[in-house]
């Protein structure tokens, strides 16, 4: 579609630029003609633009005609036209928000017009949408429509039914101003650039920079802009400011500013064109007459008093501030003035910069400067970079979203992403495509809840109902009878419908039907958590399972408008994601979208169009996920733009103060038009574009369906997942340039370079991450400042220090990632995939999947949804899967639930709300008994184990030592800046030149920045990580090692962490044992051995190397075998097994038939649960003996044991062959048993667990045991591990009823928690942190993953099924020895001590340098005693290497095992060493460290000042004095470093080496000249006798960098003779 005037503008601009270039050096008249040609097309657009501005401003300020003025003679303007579709604006004729009330009066006569195919009123837009016939004359039809609408409007007015409150449309999609405004501004920029080039070529005089300063004052003063907007509106203000700025730039011949603005406007034009294209494509569907019109009902206005005149600030999309408004009692949007009013980082800085520039300009005038100085101050404070960075990000992001089909109604919303603090997700947006049964109830015999559920679900999906079980009835002729549906409502809907299941005319049950959750709901919530914003979910029916994934929830029916307002008032700007479905069409949703700072609505083609939204996406959540992922990037882009603006202002101010800005007289100089402010703006522009492109390049999220597979029949599951054709995997689109490079990399010549190139690319990425440090921008600005006032070499030196720090950190990052990848690769799992015929019916394929014998062994990573896997004990489940076959199946799910006992599994569906989900297998669980086949339903990030990592809201990783150093840096930097300012001020007081004074101040401020801090932190953590890795602890996140040094509370998961998750026999008791016997007898006792032998006979023996059928069998047989070996007996070698009955949960016992020898009597041996075995036993006194038996069982259970009863009887049932013995026959005979005794089993504790717990308690650390086991088991295990015997056990149920304060208080006092869920584990860790504890969480399962991530230090124990815990952990223990945890804590303390001493060296030394420089400047000749290079040399010799040596060296000397006579003595020494380290003072960077820094700084300054004073007040040269001070400065710091680590050979060698390097630098001519540290005079006597002579003020040179320092070195050697001095005077005399 063509936009009127655009072609004219482009053609005129092109001709104007060409004529300007041809003008060359012609007369000014020709240049003026060229400018006129360039501007003429812009002037042609003045009329339409002014008209639009007037209309917009009238709407903005509420200007209307008189309420009594008739609309006669007025015709509706055309707002949009594309092809056969035309939009007429009804607002000028019917100025009220309820256009739909008179829709029928408008639509009917328009539809009767010849050539009109369809017409309807789009009430929310205030438009009449007309679709013309293909063969109709569009112009005639449009004129007739205008006449008819005008007549209808007049009739309505005369009928007196018009009320005309102030109103405006929600949005104005397709408004040509969206392109015309930035296009006009771009044309003005081109005019300004043409005028500038013409002025350069024609050598025309330029206007003073006060002209540009005045334009900048208008353009960048928020108060001034607000005043203009109140009079001209947004569009008028935008055009006026663009014209003012372009005129000022053209008159002053400034090229950089219009060039940057042209780039920015080009981005806005491309963004607006993309939005317009999307509107053209989606308008027929969005403005369709078949869509329902949302009802509009009055709501409470937020405008205040009724008499208050409502206003809004609507504008074209190009202005980026459009608000969607209907006032006068309908949907309250723009009069809700809080929308978008909260200032973001850019707005905050703009206000500061506006005030600061005014203050700077006033100061320049007061100090005696002229208007040019004041103008320079104003121009230096222009926050251009802040604006352009955000605009570039939003424009590129908006264009990218439009390219994927997302409709952005308000581009200003993209500019507000950086200030979002709350994300509200409406459950309506999480609706999937298919209906789902949420609750089922059976009402007739043969129709239980599960049967009703599966039949109703099949009917909803158009599938055949599954075959009934023997006790169920067939579903022939089943249908759903829906309850009457309610229409659209003004109250929030819940998305729930009711239906009866009718079979053969009879109602057999009822169901509640909602919708499946969108597959992108989980990625959406996970992305929302990563934004750092508060995540709030408003439920609808079916979203209850997502409660644990958000910060807070609200029940269905909660008013969304009220919720958004409250959250915005309480927490800040709100981003709302919702959808308007047909059954959700309420004004509550539309109003909430209107007032949300950013409103995102999913489009439902069957529902009303959400015109109040800022962005309308497609029908799924994929685009919403991308928008959420842009939040942190937008925030970072704005903050980066603000930092660049600050740096540009600082450098511009420095140029202004030193006068360097005035030295460039050539108007075409690159340095003149790319000043620091423009350079910062250009950098921000590129950075913003790059950030937006990074968001757009993010891969699409992986869908994670939440279908209730456990409640569906296996046949239904198989038909949905594997029954149909499976789509081929499609690779994502790869840019052409990447494909070309990839093809070239496989060429024979280039192939060897692939590996190094990939490594370099990875190193570059890692280095870029390391540069994200608060010191980086400070050092970058300092380097630029050094280049401005000092030397380029000084700037390169500073930049080199930054680069070395970043590369070193990047290398460490790559090493850690490679080690982690190697660990995970070693634990790659293989799985058997069943080969299923591809060509067959679904039912036959299912049968093949269940019974086929052909399998293929593949990597677990290659599994896809729909694959069938074969599993047996003791394999780990590789993915979430629905069971198809389960033979005596028991699964250990402790990694998910924390419950150490195996759970039984089944194939039959379970209730939809059943939390056990017995028909499912979950990734990471372990098969402990039986055999299974299952169909994969989820892999990778879609599994329950991986979701557990992000299942809890507000989980953040702990801050590293860098965060602590940032706090210290924020305290130190003001001191260094103050030192630089003091040096400058003192130099000026001593009558030094302004340039030299500022140069000295900058040198001090830059060189005193402790640039070694990031490197110290990186290397110290690297050293600690390497030492821990060598001991069996892989450090995945080295930055958390610092927290290890401060950990005071260690939380342990029990199952699989402190225990091996493997059962062992603890005791065997004869039936006659006393109930309260304590201690329990040993299994080697004769009576106990008989019980254990009988239990072993009842256990199922392994066959053909397949392993044990059950974990209890394995434990009992292992104990019996060990017992036989210890007793040196034959054991049960004579026991002959005749038949076996394996354990089944439904049966409750295992049995075996056998005899001793060949002639023995066949015996039936049973072992099983006491509640199953005891009723089958024959007791002498049933009442007393049964009570005694229960007492024994209860006593053993209180010890945390799993109890099995063992019984026997003779077998006289005939056949005893295994294949002929039926389990039912055994069950029938298993009565009148003789009770033999009891076997107690328990989870096996790791051998290192108790010593670890005891050592931690001895080191005054708090130990917390968290488990999902029964409280009795938890108490027993705690006692076994060394915790106090009287420790109280707190259950999850007790925690659930407590508020946060009571929760924290209880957690601080308790040591054992039982029956806790994964969410409660996180709550326990969080409660401990609120109490001020520094926590470590040690775990091995997915149920520990969120708590591991929440803790200050997360520690994962490597083992079966522990991938989720490893993925969330900062440190992974790679072997079974938990004792390495003590080494980790010691390393944390050692690292902290090293960092603390290194920080003392770095910061304390810099403090001393600043003090020495200030004193030297005050009492010297007005010059700093040392310069930038000298201070960098000092930092290199005293900070870089000595401080790093201290950082990587432990303060605590570890005992040498060779010094001790025995291993026990060495081990005792090691224990004492660890204890001494751990019970020492807690390391910190607070007051104690500050005292050390001050002490070192004072000592350093005193030593250097003393040496400098001796040199100054004794005969000698000025350079000799400076060298003496510099040498003393270095030696004083090295001496203090030696005292810090006098036991470390590395530190001693580094200190002595640094001293030697200093001597070498001083005595080596070339190096001494470069560094500015001249060597000692070879004739000390002559030097001491020569009087100090200083050249007069007129002879002082003002050169910088290498030249000035080389001159000073030559001068020191030449001052001994008058002849040489005269030559120096002639050579370096200042030119007149």
UniProtKB/Swiss-Prot annotation:
<dbReference type="InterPro" id="IPR018303">
    <property type="entry name" value="ATPase_P-typ_P_site"/>
</dbReference>
<feature type="transmembrane region" description="Helical">
    <location>
        <begin position="637"/>
        <end position="657"/>
    </location>
</feature>
<dbReference type="InterPro" id="IPR006068">
    <property type="entry name" value="ATPase_P-typ_cation-transptr_C"/>
</dbReference>
<dbReference type="GO" id="GO:0046872">
    <property type="term" value="F:metal ion binding"/>
</dbReference>
<protein>
    <recommendedName>
        <fullName>Probable cation-transporting ATPase I</fullName>
        <ecNumber>7.2.2.-</ecNumber>
    </recommendedName>
</protein>
<dbReference type="InterPro" id="IPR044492">
    <property type="entry name" value="P_typ_ATPase_HD_dom"/>
</dbReference>
<dbReference type="GO" id="GO:0005886">
    <property type="term" value="C:plasma membrane"/>
</dbReference>
<dbReference type="GO" id="GO:0005829">
    <property type="term" value="C:cytosol"/>
</dbReference>
<feature type="transmembrane region" description="Helical">
    <location>
        <begin position="673"/>
        <end position="693"/>
    </location>
</feature>
<feature type="transmembrane region" description="Helical">
    <location>
        <begin position="997"/>
        <end position="1017"/>
    </location>
</feature>
<keyword id="KW-0472">Membrane</keyword>
<feature type="active site" description="4-aspartylphosphate intermediate">
    <location>
        <position position="1053"/>
    </location>
</feature>
<dbReference type="GO" id="GO:0005524">
    <property type="term" value="F:ATP binding"/>
</dbReference>
<dbReference type="InterPro" id="IPR023298">
    <property type="entry name" value="ATPase_P-typ_TM_dom_sf"/>
</dbReference>
<feature type="transmembrane region" description="Helical">
    <location>
        <begin position="968"/>
        <end position="988"/>
    </location>
</feature>
<dbReference type="Pfam" id="PF00702">
    <property type="entry name" value="Hydrolase"/>
</dbReference>
<dbReference type="InterPro" id="IPR036412">
    <property type="entry name" value="HAD-like_sf"/>
</dbReference>
<dbReference type="InterPro" id="IPR008250">
    <property type="entry name" value="ATPase_P-typ_transduc_dom_A_sf"/>
</dbReference>
<keyword id="KW-0067">ATP-binding</keyword>
<keyword id="KW-0479">Metal-binding</keyword>
<feature type="binding site">
    <location>
        <position position="1344"/>
    </location>
    <ligand>
        <name>Mg(2+)</name>
    </ligand>
</feature>
<keyword id="KW-1278">Translocase</keyword>
<feature type="transmembrane region" description="Helical">
    <location>
        <begin position="1401"/>
        <end position="1421"/>
    </location>
</feature>
<feature type="transmembrane region" description="Helical">
    <location>
        <begin position="177"/>
        <end position="197"/>
    </location>
</feature>
<keyword id="KW-1133">Transmembrane helix</keyword>
<dbReference type="InterPro" id="IPR001757">
    <property type="entry name" value="P_typ_ATPase"/>
</dbReference>
<feature type="region of interest" description="Disordered">
    <location>
        <begin position="1573"/>
        <end position="1601"/>
    </location>
</feature>
<keyword id="KW-1003">Cell membrane</keyword>
<feature type="transmembrane region" description="Helical">
    <location>
        <begin position="358"/>
        <end position="378"/>
    </location>
</feature>
<feature type="binding site">
    <location>
        <position position="1340"/>
    </location>
    <ligand>
        <name>Mg(2+)</name>
    </ligand>
</feature>
<feature type="transmembrane region" description="Helical">
    <location>
        <begin position="1432"/>
        <end position="1452"/>
    </location>
</feature>
<dbReference type="GO" id="GO:0016887">
    <property type="term" value="F:ATP hydrolysis activity"/>
</dbReference>
<dbReference type="GO" id="GO:0005388">
    <property type="term" value="F:P-type calcium transporter activity"/>
</dbReference>
<dbReference type="GO" id="GO:0009274">
    <property type="term" value="C:peptidoglycan-based cell wall"/>
</dbReference>
<keyword id="KW-0460">Magnesium</keyword>
<feature type="transmembrane region" description="Helical">
    <location>
        <begin position="1547"/>
        <end position="1567"/>
    </location>
</feature>
<dbReference type="InterPro" id="IPR023299">
    <property type="entry name" value="ATPase_P-typ_cyto_dom_N"/>
</dbReference>
<dbReference type="GO" id="GO:0043231">
    <property type="term" value="C:intracellular membrane-bounded organelle"/>
</dbReference>
<dbReference type="InterPro" id="IPR023214">
    <property type="entry name" value="HAD_sf"/>
</dbReference>
<dbReference type="Pfam" id="PF00122">
    <property type="entry name" value="E1-E2_ATPase"/>
</dbReference>
<dbReference type="Pfam" id="PF00689">
    <property type="entry name" value="Cation_ATPase_C"/>
</dbReference>
<keyword id="KW-0547">Nucleotide-binding</keyword>
């Amino acid at each position: 579609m063509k936009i009127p005037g655009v072609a004219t503008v482009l053609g005129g601009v092109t001709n104007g630029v060409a004529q300007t270039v041809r003008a060359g050096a012609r007369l000014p008249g020709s240049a003026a003609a060229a400018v006129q040609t360039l501007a003429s097309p812009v002037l042609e657009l003045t009329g339409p633009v002014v008209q639009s501005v007037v209309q917009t401003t009238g709407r903005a300020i509420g200007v209307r005609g008189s309420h009594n003025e008739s609309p006669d003679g007025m015709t509706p303007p055309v707002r949009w036209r594309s092809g056969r579709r035309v939009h007429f604006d009804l607002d000028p004729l019917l100025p009220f928000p309820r256009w739909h009330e008179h829709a029928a009066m408008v639509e009917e006569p328009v539809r009767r017009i010849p050539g009109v195919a369809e017409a309807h009123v789009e009430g929310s837009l205030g438009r009449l949408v007309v679709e013309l016939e293909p063969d109709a004359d569009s112009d005639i039809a449009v004129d007739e429509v205008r006449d008819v609408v005008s007549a209808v409007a007049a009739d309505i007015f005369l009928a007196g039914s018009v009320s005309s409150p102030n109103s405006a449309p929600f949005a104005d999609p397709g408004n040509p101003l969206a392109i015309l405004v930035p296009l006009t501004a771009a044309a003005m920029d081109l005019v300004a650039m043409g005028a500038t080039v013409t002025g350069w070529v024609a050598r025309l005089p330029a206007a003073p920079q006060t002209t540009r300063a005045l334009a900048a004052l208008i353009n960048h003063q928020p108060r001034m802009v607000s005043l203009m907007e109140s009079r001209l509106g947004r569009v008028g203000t935008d055009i006026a400011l663009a014209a003012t700025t372009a005129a000022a730039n053209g008159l002053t011949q400034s090229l950089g500013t219009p060039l940057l603005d042209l780039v920015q406007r080009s981005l806005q034009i491309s963004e607006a064109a993309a939005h317009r294209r999307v509107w053209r494509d989606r308008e027929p569907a969005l403005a369709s007459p078949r869509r329902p019109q949302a009802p509009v009902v009055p709501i409470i206005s937020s405008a205040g008093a009724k008499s208050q005149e409502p206003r809004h600030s609507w504008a074209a999309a190009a202005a980026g501030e459009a608000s969607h408004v209907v006032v006068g009692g309908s949907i309250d949007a723009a009069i809700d003035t809080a929308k978008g009013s909260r200032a973001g980082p850019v707005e905050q800085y703009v206000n500061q910069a506006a005030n600061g520039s005014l203050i700077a300009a006033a100061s320049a005038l007061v100090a005696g400067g002229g208007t040019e100085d004041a103008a320079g101050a104003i121009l230096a404070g222009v926050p251009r970079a802040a604006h352009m960075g955000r605009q570039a990000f939003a424009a590129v992001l908006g264009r990218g979203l439009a390219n994927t089909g997302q409709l952005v109604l308000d581009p200003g919303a993209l500019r507000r992403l950086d200030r979002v603090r709350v994300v509200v997700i409406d459950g309506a947006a999480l609706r999937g495509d298919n209906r789902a049964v949420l609750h089922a109830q059976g009402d007739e015999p043969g129709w239980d809840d599960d049967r009703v559920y599966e039949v109703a679900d099949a009917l909803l999906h158009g599938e055949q109902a599954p075959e009934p079980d023997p006790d169920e009835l067939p579903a022939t002729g089943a249908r759903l009878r829906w309850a009457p549906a309610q229409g659209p409502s003004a109250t929030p809907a819940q998305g729930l419908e009711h239906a009866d299941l009718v079979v053969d005319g009879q109602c057999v049950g009822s169901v509640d039907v909602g919708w499946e959750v969108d597959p992108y709901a989980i990625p959406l919530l996970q992305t929302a958590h990563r934004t750092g914003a508060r995540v709030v979910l408003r439920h609808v029916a079916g979203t209850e399972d997502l409660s644990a994934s958000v910060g807070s929830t609200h029940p269905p029916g909660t008013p969304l408008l009220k919720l958004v307002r409250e959250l915005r008032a309480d927490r800040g700007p709100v981003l709302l994601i919702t959808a308007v479905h047909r059954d959700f069409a309420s004004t509550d949703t539309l109003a909430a979208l209107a007032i949300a700072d950013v409103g995102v609505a999913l489009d439902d083609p069957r529902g009303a169009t959400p015109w109040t939204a800022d962005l309308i996406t497609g029908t799924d959540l994929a685009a919403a996920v991308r928008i959420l992922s842009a939040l942190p990037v937008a925030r970072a882009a704005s903050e980066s733009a603000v930092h660049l603006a600050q740096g540009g202002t600082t450098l511009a101010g420095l140029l202004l103060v030193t006068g360097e800005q005035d030295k460039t007289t050539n108007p075409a100089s690159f340095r003149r038009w790319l000043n620091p402010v423009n350079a910062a703006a250009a950098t921000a522009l590129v950075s913003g574009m790059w950030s937006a492109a990074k968001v757009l390049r993010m891969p699409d999220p992986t869908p994670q369906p939440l279908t209730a597979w456990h409640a569906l029949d296996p046949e239904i599951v198989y038909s949905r997942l594997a029954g149909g054709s499976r789509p081929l995997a499609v690779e994502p689109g790869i840019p052409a340039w990447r494909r070309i490079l990839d093809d070239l990399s496989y060429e024979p010549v280039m192939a060897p370079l692939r590996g190094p190139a990939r490594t370099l690319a990875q190193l570059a990425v890692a280095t870029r991450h390391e540069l994200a440090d608060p010191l980086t921008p400070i050092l970058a600005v300092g380097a630029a400042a050094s280049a401005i006032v000092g030397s380029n070499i000084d700037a390169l030196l500073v930049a080199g220090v930054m680069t070395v720090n970043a590369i070193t950190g990047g290398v460490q990052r790559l090493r850690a990632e490679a080690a982690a990848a190697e660990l995970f690769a070693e634990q790659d799992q293989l799985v058997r995939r069943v080969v299923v015929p591809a060509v067959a019916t679904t039912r036959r394929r299912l049968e093949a999947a269940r019974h086929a014998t052909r399998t293929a062994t593949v990597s677990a990573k290659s599994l896809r949804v729909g694959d069938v896997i074969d599993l047996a004990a003791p394999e780990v489940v590789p993915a979430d899967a629905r069971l198809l076959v389960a033979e005596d199946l028991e699964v250990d799910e402790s990694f998910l639930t924390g419950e150490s006992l195996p759970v039984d599994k089944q194939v039959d569906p379970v209730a939809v709300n059943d939390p056990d989900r017995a028909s499912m297998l979950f990734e990471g669980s372990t098969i402990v008994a039986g055999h299974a086949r299952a169909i994969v339903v989820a892999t990778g990030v879609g599994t329950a184990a991986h979701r557990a990592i992000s299942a809890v809201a507000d989980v953040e990783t702990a801050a590293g030592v860098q965060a602590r150093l940032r706090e210290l840096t924020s305290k130190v930097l003001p001191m260094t800046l103050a030192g630089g300012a003091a040096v400058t001020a003192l130099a000026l007081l001593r009558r030094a030149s302004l340039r030299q004074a500022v140069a000295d101040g900058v040198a001090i401020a830059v060189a005193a920045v402790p640039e070694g801090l990031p490197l110290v932190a990186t290397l110290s953590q690297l050293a600690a990580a390497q030492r821990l890795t060598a001991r069996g602890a892989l450090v995945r996140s080295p930055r958390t090692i610092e927290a290890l040094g401060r950990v005071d509370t260690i939380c342990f998961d029990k199952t699989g962490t402190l225990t091996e998750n493997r059962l062992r026999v603890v005791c065997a008791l004869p039936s006659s044992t006393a109930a309260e016997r304590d201690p329990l007898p040993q299994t080697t006792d004769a009576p106990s051995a008989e019980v254990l032998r009988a239990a072993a006979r009842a256990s199922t023996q392994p066959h053909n190397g397949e392993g044990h059928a059950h974990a209890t069998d394995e434990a009992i047989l292992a104990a019996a075998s060990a017992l036989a070996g210890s007793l040196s007996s034959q054991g049960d070698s004579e026991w002959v097994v005749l038949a076996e009955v394996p354990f089944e949960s439904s049966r409750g016992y295992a049995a075996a038939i056998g005899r001793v020898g060949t002639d023995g009597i066949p015996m039936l041996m049973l072992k099983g649960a006491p509640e199953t075995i005891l009723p089958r036993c024959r007791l002498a006194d049933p009442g007393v003996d049964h009570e005694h038996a229960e007492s024994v069982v209860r006593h053993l259970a209180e010890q945390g044991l799993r109890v099995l009863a063992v019984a026997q009887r003779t077998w006289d049932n005939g056949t005893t062959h295994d294949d002929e013995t039926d389990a039912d026959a055994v069950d029938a005979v298993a009565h009148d048993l003789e009770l033999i005794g009891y076997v107690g089993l328990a989870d096996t504790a790791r051998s290192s667990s108790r010593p670890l717990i005891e050592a931690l308690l001895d080191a005054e650390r708090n130990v917390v045991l968290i488990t999902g086991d029964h409280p009795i088991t938890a108490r027993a295990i705690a006692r076994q591990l060394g915790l106090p015997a009287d420790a109280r056990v707190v259950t999850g149920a007790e925690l659930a009823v407590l508020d946060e304060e009571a929760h924290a208080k209880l957690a601080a006092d308790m040591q054992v928690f039982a029956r806790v869920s994964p969410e409660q584990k996180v709550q326990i860790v969080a409660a401990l942190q609120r109490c001020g504890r520094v926590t470590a969480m040690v775990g091995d399962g997915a149920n520990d993953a969120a708590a591991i991530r929440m803790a200050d230090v997360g520690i994962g124990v490597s083992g079966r099924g522990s991938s989720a815990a490893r993925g969330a952990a900062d440190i992974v223990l790679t072997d079974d020895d938990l004792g390495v945890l003590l080494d980790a804590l010691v390393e944390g303390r050692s690292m902290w001590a090293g960092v603390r001493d290194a920080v003392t060296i770095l910061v304390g030394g810099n403090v001393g340098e600043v003090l020495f420089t200030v004193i030297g400047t005050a009492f010297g000749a007005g010059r700093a005693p040392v310069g930038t290079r000298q201070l960098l040399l000092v930092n290199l010799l005293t900070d870089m290497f000595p401080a790093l040596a201290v950082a990587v060296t432990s303060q605590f000397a570890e005992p040498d095992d060779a010094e001790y006579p025995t291993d026990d003595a060495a081990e005792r020494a090691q224990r004492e060493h660890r204890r001494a380290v751990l019970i020492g003072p807690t390391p910190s960077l607070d007051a104690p460290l500050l005292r050390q820094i001050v002490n070192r700084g004072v000592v350093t300054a005193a030593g250097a000042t003393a040496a400098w004073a001796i040199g100054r007040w004794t005969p000698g040269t000025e350079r000799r004095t400076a060298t003496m001070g510099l040498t003393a400065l270095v030696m004083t710091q090295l001496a203090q470093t030696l005292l810090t680590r006098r036991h470390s050979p590395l530190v001693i060698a580094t200190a002595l080496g640094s001293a030697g390097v200093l001597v070498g630098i001083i005595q080596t001519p070339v190096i001494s000249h470069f560094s500015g540290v001249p060597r000692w005079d070879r004739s000390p006597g002559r030097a001491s006798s020569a009087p100090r002579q200083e050249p007069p003020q007129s002879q002082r040179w003002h050169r910088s960098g290498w030249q000035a320092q080389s001159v000073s070195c030559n001068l020191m050697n030449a001052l001994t003779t008058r002849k040489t001095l005269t030559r120096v005077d002639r050579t370096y005399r200042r030119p007149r």
